[in-house]
C-alpha cells in the first residue's frame, strides 16, 4: 500500500480527502484577501515582511513557566523549534499556555486545580489555532496534564500537528553519604522521605539531603509517572517523531529534535496527515498496551479516554481491562521498579520497546504516524533491545503475568474504579475501613500514629472526586507517606480522587459514583469491612442492602466548596472519571 493510499484509508474524520496542495489553506484567509487589510496591518506590526504573507503559519505552542522543573526549559525549546520552522520556509507563530505543577501543589488545595488545567490547555490551544487560522501546530508540553491537554486540542482542531515532549529529568544524587538513601533519587524519594522521617527511619539531615538533591534540573518527573507515561503514549499513538518521549530534557538528542522539527512538520503538512488520521481505535489500543506493559500511570485511563473523545473515538476503562488481561508487565520502571526514563534511551528508547512488542504481535502495525510511516515501518527501522539489558524484561519472564492496571466493579464502585496493583503488595486485600473526608485529615492521623502496622486497614479518602473536591486531586502525599512509613502491606488506600503516576502500593482510585454524587463510597463508615479482589476485578463493601438503604436515606449532599471561578464552572460541567472527566460529554 502506498503512503498516499495509507493516509486516505486511515482518514476517518477530516474534510479533506487528498494530499494537501496548498499548505497555507487556513492562514490565507487572513493573509491574502484585500478585504483583510486590517488583519495584515496587525501582522506587519509583529514583524511580518511581504514574503511572509504567502508562507504557511505554524502555531508553536508551549506550556512554559519558570516555576516548575518540568516546564522551565520549554521556552528555550519553543525558540529552537521556531527557528527550525523558519528555516524550513514556514512562518512560526509562537504562543504559550499555563501549567500546574502537581509536585509543588501536591497535598494542598492547589491540587484541585491540576486536572482542570488539562481542559484549560486543550481549550487554549484549540482557541488560538482556530481563531488565528494557523495551518499546523507544534505542541511542546512536559508536565502531567500538558500532554493530554495538547493531544485533546489536536483531536479538536485536526490540523497537521507534532508533539515535542519536553523530556524527562535526570536522576538526582544525595551528598550526605548515608547508606539508607539510594544513590539515584527523584521526586518520589522526596515525598517518601517524609514518611521515613516521621517513622524515625531518616534523620532530619537525611530528609533534607533527599529534598535538596531529588530534582537536579529541567525535565519531567523521572520514573514511569504520569508525564513519561503520557509522552510514551503520545509516541505510540504516532503524534511525535521517533524517541521523542525517551530523549532526556537535557540531551543533545532533544536539541536535535527541535532543530529538525521544521522539516518534519513541513512533511506532515505536505502529506496531509491530520491528527484524526492518527488517533484511531487501533492506535489507542497500541497506546494502552504500551502503558500496561511498561507499568504506566493510572492517569492514562482518564487521559486516553479524554483524548479519544476529542477525536470521536469511543474508548472506555473496559478497553484497558481487556488489554490488561493479556498484556504482561515487563517494564521495570519506578515507582514500583528500579529504573527511570532517562535509562531507557541507553537501550534504544521507546522505539525499541515498540519494536519488541510489535515483533511479538502485541501492537497493530498499520497505524499512521506524523512522519508518514506506519508503526510497523518505524519498528523495522528501530534497533532491537540489546541482549542482557534489564529495563525491559522478556515476555517469557515478566514482572507480572498480566497488567497492573485493573478496572474493578462491585458494591463500592458500581460505575467502576481503577486499581494500580503490581502484585508486590498482593492482589487480594480485606480490611476494616478508616474514613477521612479529605487527605489532610489522613496525614494528621498518620502523624499521630493512628494507622498501625499489622492491622489490615482500608483507608478511605472521599469527597475528592471531580465534582466533590472539585478537580479530583491526586493522593501522592498519602500514598508516599504510607510507603515511607512501611505500611504498604498493611494498608489499602481507596479514593474517589486520583493517584499520581508516582504512587505505588495497594491503591484504588477513580471510584464512580463519587461521594459528592451520593455514591456508596460516601456511605462507608469506620469499621466497615471492604474486600478488594483484583484477580476477579471486584471491590465490595460488606454491608447489607438494608443498612445501605438506611444510610442513603440519611445522606445529605454537601454544599459546593466553590461557588465562583474556574473550579465552580468545572464542578458543574465535568463528567465522571469513567468518562474521562471531559467537559463536553
Swiss-Prot record:
Enzyme nomenclature, EC number: 4.2.1.9
InterPro entries documented for this protein: DHAD_IlvD/Edd, Dihydro-acid_dehy_C, DihydroxyA_deHydtase, DiOHA_6PGluconate_deHydtase_CS, ILV_EDD_C, ILV_EDD_N, IlvD/EDD_N
Top-rank taxon: Eukaryota
Residues noted as binding [2Fe-2S] cluster in the record, renumbered to the chain: 70, 143, 221
Cofactor note: Binds 1 [2Fe-2S] cluster per subunit.
Keywords noted in UniProt: 2Fe-2S, Amino-acid biosynthesis, Branched-chain amino acid biosynthesis, Iron, Iron-sulfur, Lyase, Magnesium, Metal-binding, Mitochondrion, Transit peptide
Active-site residues (renumbered): 500 (proton acceptor)
Induction: Expression is significantly repressed when the pH changes from pH 5.0 to 3.0.
Pathway assignment: Amino-acid biosynthesis; L-isoleucine biosynthesis; L-isoleucine from 2-oxobutanoate: step 3/4; Amino-acid biosynthesis; L-valine biosynthesis; L-valine from pyruvate: step 3/4
Catalysed reactions, as listed in the record: (2R)-2,3-dihydroxy-3-methylbutanoate = 3-methyl-2-oxobutanoate + H2O; (2R,3R)-2,3-dihydroxy-3-methylpentanoate = (S)-3-methyl-2-oxopentanoate + H2O
A Pfam family recorded for this sequence: ILVD_EDD_N
Uses in industry and biotechnology: The branched chain alcohol isobutanol exhibits superior physicochemical properties as an alternative biofuel. Overexpression of isobutanol pathway enzymes such as ILV3 can enhance production of alcohol precursors and are of great interest for biofuel production.
Function: Dihydroxyacid dehydratase that catalyzes the third step in the common pathway leading to biosynthesis of branched-chain amino acids. Catalyzes the dehydration of (2R,3R)-2,3-dihydroxy-3-methylpentanoate (2,3-dihydroxy-3-methylvalerate) into 2-oxo-3-methylpentanoate (2-oxo-3-methylvalerate) and of (2R)-2,3-dihydroxy-3-methylbutanoate (2,3-dihydroxyisovalerate) into 2-oxo-3-methylbutanoate (2-oxoisovalerate), the penultimate precursor to L-isoleucine and L-valine, respectively.
This protein's name: Dihydroxy-acid dehydratase, mitochondrial
Species the sequence originates in: Saccharomyces cerevisiae (strain ATCC 204508 / S288c) (Baker's yeast)
Organism lineage string: Eukaryota, Fungi, Dikarya, Ascomycota, Saccharomycotina
